[in-house]
Structure formats: C-alpha cells, structure tokens
Amino acid sequence: MSSTTASPVTVAVTGAAGHIGYAALFRIAAGAMLGHTTPVTLRLLELPDAVRAAEGVVMELEDGAFPLLAGTEIYDDPTRAFDGVDVALLIGARPRTKGMERADLLGANAEIFATSGKALNAGASPDVRVLVVGNPANTNALVASAHAPDIPADRFTALTRLDHNRAVAATARHSGVPVTEISRMTIWGNHSPTQYPDIFHAVVGGRSGADYAADTRWLTDDFIPTVARRGTAIIEARGASSAASAANGAIDHIDDWVHGTPDGDWTSVALPSPGAYGVDEGLVCSFPCRSVGGRWEIVEGLDINPFSRARIDASVAELRTERDAVAALGLL
C-alpha cells in the first residue's frame, strides 16, 4: 500500500452520507489514512433513501480533484459494496431514539451488522481490515465477525481510538505537555461510559503517568469521567454527536493498522479477546495494542493495580451483558 503504481486500495464506507462518513471521506481521498502515495477507490454504501445525498458527496469528492482518488462508487446493496473490498469502515448504525430501550437498540443494530458480516464474508478481500464505528461498536463488531466465519476474527475491530485520543488530549490540558509527548495511553473495555482510560502506564513528557494518577481527585473526578462522557458533553455543546473527531479516530486506527504503531508506543483497539488480562475469550474489548506487520498485537505483561482492575472488570461485565442480550435474540 505504498506505491502509486500499485492497484488502488478499495475502501468501503457505510453510512457514507452521514456526518462521520462525510468527515472521513475527504481525508481518505487526500491520503491521510493509507498514505500520500497510495491510490484509493471509495465505495459509499447508503440506505436507498440516502443514495441521493451520497451522490452529492461524490460530486464534492470529484470537485476536490484528489490525485489519489482513483474512483468513487455508490451502493445500496452491501454484498456488492463489499465485493473485493480491502478496508471497510462500518459507520452506519441505527441511532437511539426517544423511548427506545438499550436492548431494542442492541437488537436493531445487531441485525444491521449481521447483514454486514454476511456480505463481507461473501466477497471481501481475504485480508480485509474491518473497523466498526457505529454504536454499540464493540458488540456490533462481535456480531459482524460471528456472521463472517471465513474471515479471521482478528480482522474485525471496533473504534476506541477516539476515546484514546480524548484521554491524550485531556492529559495534555491538565499537564501542559503537548500531545506529541504523551505516549502509552490505554483505553480498556467498552466504548461506553464504563470504559476505563488508564494513565498509569502512560509516559507524559518523560514522566510516568502514575505521577499524575497520584492526584486521585483529578483522576477520579476529572480525568476518567471527562474522557468517558466526552461524547455527551459534545452533544450538549453543539447539538450533535462527535463527527470530525470520530472520523479522525477511525483514520488514525487504520493508519496505524496499515503502517504500524510508532516505536516505543501503543494505541487502544477493541478486538476479540484471546483471554488476555482476564477478559472472556471472544469478547470484543479494548486493549493496549501495537500494530506489527499489519496485525494487531495486545501489549502483554502490564501490571494492573486494584484500582484499574475494578474498572476494567466493570466495563467487561457490561460487554458480557451486551453479548448475552444479542445472543438471546439468536444473532450470535
């Protein structure tokens, strides 16, 4: 994925005319995700009643005259959209509406992502990289993978890079250290308010993150809730959910997956647990990860103190509940 003489990389984006898809597509076309020498073909997948909006997005992509954009295609059929695809950003999901119970939301989206999994299984590239952004992202990724038995489970991931970036930014605001000098941050668990942003293993301007965690009031009353509930704060401030920052997190995630994480650093990725850190095998849980040779590897051997253990366990318990709710619907 590094030469302009190579065949274009085919990238499918679901919910492509939505706010996150719109924010992501132009940066992907400009080379921010796969590199500035890698041509891309973009496949925009939308619901039939949103195809017209997707046509408008394609007009804008054409008008950008991006040198790396080899082509754009619009689909309302996931099987056609995912045929031969190399990267799939599964952004489209049903939002929670007034009066909808969480179980109803889980069920509605599980059906959507079961369909996506089947379509990917039918014809995606053998080494496809799948990133689920649509919420509840962890469990949606679990469902999609379950319906794609011919694709290795480790090719399915869910987005916690947005949360990771939020944790880095919150630490930068508190410490006065630039984000470029903050490394080894970790998000554990679910992409939900139960997530656990872990600064204990981070390096902040050459200092141990544990030094900052020693300020327990900041840690428990500011840092953790600010990161975990940042999405809600953004909705309250702008009247709409995170879009540009979510798109940026997705681009960062795929960029690291393709090109590798920086030496001495790691990032946060929700992927199927192999049983690491006591997390049930198969649960799609966020871990500290490095990208090596195009594959994610969980960072092993970190010391988990009792404070962290309790918070990781709480988020994992929520993931179990989500899994069991979807399984009860016959979708796992």
Swiss-Prot record:
InterPro entries: L-lactate/malate_DH, Lactate/malate_DH_C, Lactate/malate_DH_N, Lactate_DH/Glyco_Ohase_4_C, Malate_DH_type2, NAD(P)-bd_dom_sf. Coiled coil: none annotated. SUPFAM superfamilies: LDH C-terminal domain-like (SSF56327), NAD(P)-binding Rossmann-fold domains (SSF51735). Its EC number is 1.1.1.37. It comes from the Bacteria. The keyword NAD applies. One of its GO terms (molecular function) is L-malate dehydrogenase (NAD+) activity. CDD domains: MDH_chloroplast-like (cd01338). Substrate binds at residues 96, 102, 135, 166. Gene3D superfamilies: Lactate dehydrogenase/glycoside hydrolase, family 4, C-terminal (3.90.110.10), NAD(P)-binding Rossmann-like Domain (3.40.50.720). Keywords: NAD, Oxidoreductase, Tricarboxylic acid cycle. It is an enzyme of class 1 (oxidoreductase). NAD(+) binds at residues 15-21, 109, 133-135. Belongs to the LDH/MDH superfamily. MDH type 2 family. Catalyzes the reversible oxidation of malate to oxaloacetate. PANTHER family: MALATE DEHYDROGENASE. NCBIfam families: MalateDH-SF1, PRK05442.1. This is Malate dehydrogenase. It comes from Mycolicibacterium vanbaalenii (strain DSM 7251 / JCM 13017 / BCRC 16820 / KCTC 9966 / NRRL B-24157 / PYR-1). The gene is mdh.
